[in-house]
């Protein structure tokens, strides 16, 4: 699913959104506390999102310090593959990962995907925390750096191939705000660097803007939406922007994320720069993420 957006309009929209975050976050002094002469405290915002992924995109949430988060992500084939493939259920790709919270602000993670036999790792650091009271901060912000290594054989083994050609890097700033107990929104400006591209018409550095949102439906369920807009003239014809919709279901120590997406890959270099599915043609995957946390320290 692609939408045509003028770059200047995009910049203006970003400025307006950030300004809206700041405007809605101005804290009012508590008259009662002032009368009593009590010191005002800082109240930090928690659970902007339920887990550290919206669907594909990382969220501003971190795995807590000393907690190990085991994730299993499953992506079936396209729904339009027909009854012979049981609408995609006969095809599947999987990613198994482990995230760990080193501190309350710093987390790391590793994973392996069956799609293109890719290994990935990341580091995420929380820069700002949304808060009100004595110290006011309108948003939560994090920095994410990832790397991925594709291990499938080179398509042309007769030429000189380099190990560095298998490498991909992603740098992302996550800016999120919890507007109420029910509504959270996040923006994710991103650059994906690819050491090797297939054609000269493709850019090694791919710039994009991800946007995600969460609508809490009940105490344990929520509706999530996610869209990644890739700026024009960076990818070869046929690639599309990633769009996903899903539901989070919390059951004790597990969180199930059920979703539909036109992206096959479950890591940044793939769903941002390599999505080919067209929602209008039924090129949509059903998939799920399962998260189970363990306190190890």
Model-predicted segments: where are they?
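Extended, charged alpha-helical interaction scaffolds
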Residues: 196-197, 201
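Transmembrane beta-barrel domains of Gram-negative outer membranes and organellar outer membranes
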Residues: 28-159, 167-171, 176-187, 191-195, ...
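N-terminal signal peptide c-region/cleavage motif recognized by signal peptidases
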Residues: 22-24
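Charged helix-capping and loop-helix junction motifs
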Residues: 203-208, 239-243
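N-terminal secretory signal peptides that target proteins for export/translocation
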Residues: 1-9
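Surface-exposed extracellular loop regions of Gram-negative outer-membrane beta-barrel proteins
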Residues: 92-94, 209, 214-224
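Sec-dependent signal peptide hydrophobic core
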Residues: 10-17
């Amino acid at each position: 699913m692609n939408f045509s957006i003028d770059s200047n309009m995009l910049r203006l929209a970003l400025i307006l959104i950030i300004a809206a975050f700041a405007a809605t976050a101005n804290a009012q002094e508590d008259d009662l506390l002032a009368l009593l002469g009590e010191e005002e405290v800082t109240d930090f915002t928690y659970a902007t999102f339920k887990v550290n992924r919206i669907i594909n995109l990382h969220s501003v949430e971190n795995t807590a310090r000393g907690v190990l988060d085991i994730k299993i992500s499953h992506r079936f084939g396209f729904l339009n593959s027909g009854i012979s493939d049981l609408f995609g259920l006969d095809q599947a790709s999987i990613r198994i990962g482990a995230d760990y919270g080193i501190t309350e602000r710093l987390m790391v993670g590793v994973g392996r995907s069956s799609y293109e036999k890719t290994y990935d790792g990341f580091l995420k650091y929380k820069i700002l925390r949304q808060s009100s009271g004595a110290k006011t901060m309108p948003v939560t912000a994090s920095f994410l750096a990832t790397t991925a290594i594709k291990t499938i054989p080179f398509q042309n083994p007769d030429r000189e191939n380099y190990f560095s050609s298998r490498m991909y890097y992603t740098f992302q700033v996550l800016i999120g705000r919890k507007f109420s107990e029910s509504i959270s929104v996040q923006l994710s400006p991103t650059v994906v660097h690819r050491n090797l591209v297939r054609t000269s018409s493709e850019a090694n550095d791919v710039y994009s803007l991800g946007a995600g949102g969460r609508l809490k439906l009940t105490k344990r369920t929520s509706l999530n939406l996610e869209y990644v807009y890739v700026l024009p003239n960076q990818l070869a014809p046929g690639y599309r922007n990633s769009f996903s919709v899903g539901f989070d279901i919390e059951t004790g120590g597990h969180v199930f994320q059920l979703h539909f997406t036109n992206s096959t890959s479950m890591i940044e270099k793939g769903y941002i720069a390599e999505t080919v599915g067209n929602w209008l043609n039924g090129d949509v995957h059903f998939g799920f993420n399962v998260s189970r946390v363990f306190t190890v320290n």
